[in-house]
Amino acid sequence: MNPNQKIITIGSVSIVLTTVGLLLQITSLCSIWFSHYNQVTQTNGQPCSNDTINYYNETFVNVTNVQNNYTTITEPSIPQAIHYSSGRDLCPVKGWAPLSKDNGIRIGSRGEVFVIREPFISCSINECRTFFLTQGALLNDKHSNGTVKDRSPFRTLMSCPIGVAPSPSNSRFESVAWSATACSDGPGWLTLGITGPDTTAVAVLKYNGVITDTLKSWKGNIMRTQESECVCQDEFCYTLVTDGPSDAQAFYKILKIKKGKIVGAKDVDATGFHFEECSCYPSGENVECVCRDNWRGSNRPWIRFNSDLDYQIGYVCSGVFGDNPRPVDGTGSCNSPVNNGKGRYGVKGFSFRYGDGVWIGRTKSLESRSGFEMVWDANGWVSTDKDSNGVQDIIDNDNWSGYSGSFSIRGETTGRNCTVPCFWVEMIRGQPKEKTIWTSGSSIAFCGVNSDTTSWSWPDGALLPFDIDK
């Protein structure tokens, strides 16, 4: 065979081998495709799985991962909204541990901090927020002049995360209001802000920031509400509203609200009682509130109601009196106000009932809004004596306090089958007790624990006057 024939022969063999190899590749690919197709059609309707299938032929070994995820259209699942439920009692408490302190007045001497009053705290499942009524002004600014006034068109309800000084950069607008309450039902936030003239004030209800309902003053005499959190359970929220004199018989309504809409209301028949600025908390299937008697009582009135708005009323029996001004501790009353010449006026406050016992929060001073302490009276809900079983100091009597109120952290947040009781204390600075042109406050908050705690003084601590006051 001559060289040319050898070349032709080698070329022909190469072409044949190449052709055979190509055909084998095509055959292998077809085999893979048909095998995959058959497996998909045979397993249609079975759960998805990941299988490893090995294919062999004379030319190569191919290991292919085949995922049996044949086309299925599934609607995206929407997680169920969690609502606060009823049925939990208050968690056992031996004392009170600090939760937060905002130091707003100290920081405000050189920072952009709102002039505020009536701060309160409320918690959703995911966060706790400080709500407060601004005066449309900042500390150490000319617009802070005259902010001792309670009701003005510049007052708004705003909120910020707990433990921070309330400023324009961290605060959220909630409502135009000079009296307010707010609470979460779990999925959303309810706010109720009251504004307008004294004789025709209107309450504007919002759910997640959208106006959902209104309520007009029904007695034409400074309709007002809690200045602390409302209470939500089983998709409904509850609050109390007062209309009428601050120093005589007034009129009261319990409101039942769902997603910002008033779905029930009941007038409270409370002749001889005076309910203002109630501090409320969930208790089993009920809501319990301890309020301010600005008319005659140095002891605090209470109201308990259920989801049907059936209610009971009374006064905290204990001779450890909770209001300010007040007489020295003595003999209390379960059904009527204790006056002793000190019952008129008052300050917002709170108590927590534990069976026959009661934790009472109160100022240390009998006459002025200064100092603060928590007193445990083991029989104070049913007995009128003045015996107490322990005191925890919160603010010493040389430093200003102010309003105080309750809030709670629910089992949906903590995972516990009980409700954690908590409280906040406002520390008012400026007018009328100090030589400034303004009135504002900071706040501190504590929660109940069933472990060790301590007494101390956690005052506001700001050095006054500010530059604007000089």
From Swiss-Prot:
Its EC number is 3.2.1.18. Substrate binds at R117, R151, E276, E277, R292, R369. Catalyzes the removal of terminal sialic acid residues from viral and cellular glycoconjugates. Cleaves off the terminal sialic acids on the glycosylated HA during virus budding to facilitate virus release. Additionally helps virus spread through the circulation by further removing sialic acids from the cell surface. These cleavages prevent self-aggregation and ensure the efficient spread of the progeny virus from cell to cell. Otherwise, infection would be limited to one round of replication. Residues 1-6 are intravirion. It catalyses: Hydrolysis of alpha-(2->3)-, alpha-(2->6)-, alpha-(2->8)- glycosidic linkages of terminal sialic acid residues in oligosaccharides, glycoproteins, glycolipids, colominic acid and synthetic substrates. Homotetramer. Its main location: virion. This is Neuraminidase.
